[in-house]
Curated annotation (Swiss-Prot):
Gene (UniProt): sqv-4
Residues noted as binding substrate in the record, renumbered to the chain: 168-172, 227-231, 267, 274-280, 345-346, 447
GO molecular function: identical protein binding; NAD binding; UDP-glucose 6-dehydrogenase activity
SMART domains found in the cross-reference section: UDPG_MGDP_dh_C
PANTHER family attached to this UniProt entry: UDP-GLUCOSE 6-DEHYDROGENASE, UDP-GLUCOSE DEHYDROGENASE/UDP-MANNAC DEHYDROGENASE
Gene Ontology cellular component list: cytoplasm; nucleus
Enzyme class: oxidoreductase
GO BP, sorted A to Z: egg-laying behavior; embryo development ending in birth or egg hatching; glycosaminoglycan biosynthetic process; morphogenesis of an epithelium; reproductive process; UDP-glucuronate biosynthetic process; vulval development
Name recorded for this polypeptide: UDP-glucose 6-dehydrogenase
Tissue specificity field: Expressed in the vulva and in oocytes.
Length: 481
């Protein structure tokens, strides 16, 4: 019988205090009061925010859980060596951005932070540790982590490591609900006795609130690939319905009606069939590109091309929407004030990573439009930094104004462009807004949340993704613009 290498987990550490690490560990602390959970990060300012009354990320329900558990069995610290030394189980939850240089530029994930954390664990471990990939990583990343940790074992017989894959399946804006009631928890590990022990310990943590039949165990590689494939399938759904939105605009069909009819087929289902200006966020594009790169590396060009098409449609949809705005505003937006409603990549989050708003705004800035931006959760500094990263700081200063309320953003504007589906945008007094705008006033609904008929009755010209144009000012006259 194999000796028990790993004892019962009583101390959990997460390296990385971002959108995944913070909420995940808050939920573990909430559901497992007998386990001490510590979130560590090199960014001392971020840790200070986690220890303050204003948390560094906005997520419905997060504040209540953090404030209840913090100081009891949930802690935030920048003392990484101490936390690693004391931990039984360590989550790696650091950023894995797309590489912007060298081999794999623009496609492959950059694993430098994962490697750095792995070396830090090897340096300060001191005893047996279960190491868990929480970051989205390419297939075989656990093998790289394990290689680093095994080298450390050669010099210290007290060190024993097992590397598991436990990808997150959170949707920002509903992360706490997703954590409290997940569709599934996926854990990948080795089939060795030690690997099975490590998997069992992580299963035991989740069993405190997740039914055992929702906890799936696989080999490590299947777990890593499943995460990429899940996000690729979701992104594919969005690109699929967005491609059909262009057909609807050209034919007089309504995308909402088409999606509703198609979604009634139980083999297809209705989720992720909401046409829009395009998907954003930290995961979808990054993970699809990672899958494309993997397929190219495996000499599977047809598969790589198939998934690259998902990204191509998303980029085309953003460009198409921006071109539509320009065309409908008499083919010029130069020096025209345009109000932008929404900057986050989706509602109920302040996250702006890969937001479609950034891309649409960039295209309009290239035409020298003057843009007045409002978002209820995104900080002004975040907006300006994001835009300066895709254009120039001078153009941002010259063309961008950030407002603290939507009425101010729309005052004197030629058009309103809805780029995030915030609930508050549905409830605004559009009669008042219309009175304060340039006429003819237009609304471009990139999220299909507004009542187009009611807006037309007020006097707006309306244009929505996947619907026939209202008044035919379009100089191009086709869905492709």
């Amino acid at each position: 019988m194999t000796d028990q290498v790993f004892g019962k987990v009583s101390k959990v550490v997460c390296v990385g205090a971002g959108y995944v690490g913070g909420p995940t560990c808050a939920m573990i602390a909430h559901k497992c009061p007998h386990i001490t959970v510590t979130v560590v990060d090199m960014n001392t300012a971020k840790i200070a925010e986690w220890n303050s009354d204003k948390l560094p990320i906005y997520e419905p329900g997060l504040d209540e859980i953090v404030f209840a558990a913090r100081g009891r069995n949930l802690f935030f610290s920048s003392d990484i060596p101490k936390a690693i030394a004391e931990a039984d189980l360590i989550f790696i939850s650091v950023n894995t951005p797309t590489k912007m240089y060298g081999r794999g530029k623009g496609m492959a994930p950059d694993l430098k932070y994962v490697e750095s954390v792995s070396r830090t664990i090897a340096q300060y471990a001191g005893g047996p540790k279960i190491v868990v990939e929480k970051s989205t990583v390419p297939v075989k990343a656990a093998e790289s982590i394990g290689c680093i940790l095994r080298e450390a074992q050669k010099n210290n017989e007290n060190l024993k490591f097992q590397v598991l894959s436990n990808p997150e399946f959170l949707a920002e804006g509903t992360a706490m609900k997703d954590l409290a009631n997940p569709d599934r928890v996926l854990i990948g590990g080795e089939s060795s006795p030690e690997g099975l022990q490590a998997v069992a310990e992580l299963v035991r943590i989740y069993e405190n609130w997740v039914p055992r039949n929702r906890i799936i165990t696989t080999n490590t590689w299947s777990s890593e690939l499943s995460k990429l494939v899940a996000n690729a399938f979701l992104a594919q759904r969005i690109s699929s319905i967005n491609s059909i939105s262009a057909v609807c605009e050209a034919t007089g069909a309504e995308i909402s009606e088409v999606a509703h009819a198609v979604g009634y087929d139980t083999r297809i289902g209705s989720k992720f069939l909401q046409a829009s200006v395009g998907f954003g966020g930290s995961c979808f594009q990054k993970d699809v590109l990672s899958l494309v790169y993997l397929c190219e590396s495996l000499n599977l060009p047809q598969v790589a091309d198939y998934w690259q098409g998902v990204i191509n449609i998303n980029n085309w949809q953003r460009r198409r929407f921006a071109d539509k705005i320009i065309a409908e505003l008499f083919n010029t937006v130069t020096d025209k004030k345009i109000a932008i409603f929404g900057f986050a990549f989706k509602k109920n989050t302040g996250d702006t990573r890969e937001s479609s708003a950034i891309h649409v705004i960039k295209h309009l800035m290239e035409e020298h439009a003057k843009l007045s931006v409002y978002d209820p959760k995104v900080q002004k500094s975040q907006m300006l930094n994001d835009l300066a990263s895709v254009t120039s700081a001078q153009d941002v200063e010259r063309l961008i104004t950030v407002e603290s309320d939507p009425y101010a953003a729309a005052r004197g504007a030629h058009a309103i462009v809805v780029l995030t589906e915030w609930d508050e945008f549905v409830e605004l007094n559009y009669s008042q807004i219309h009175n304060d705008m340039q006429h003819p006033a237009a609304i471009f609904d990139g999220r299909l949340i507004l009542d187009q008929k009611a807006l037309r009755e007020i006097g707006f010209r309306t244009f929505a993704i996947g619907t026939s144009p209202d008044q035919a000012y379009n100089l191009f006259g086709t869905a492709g613009y």
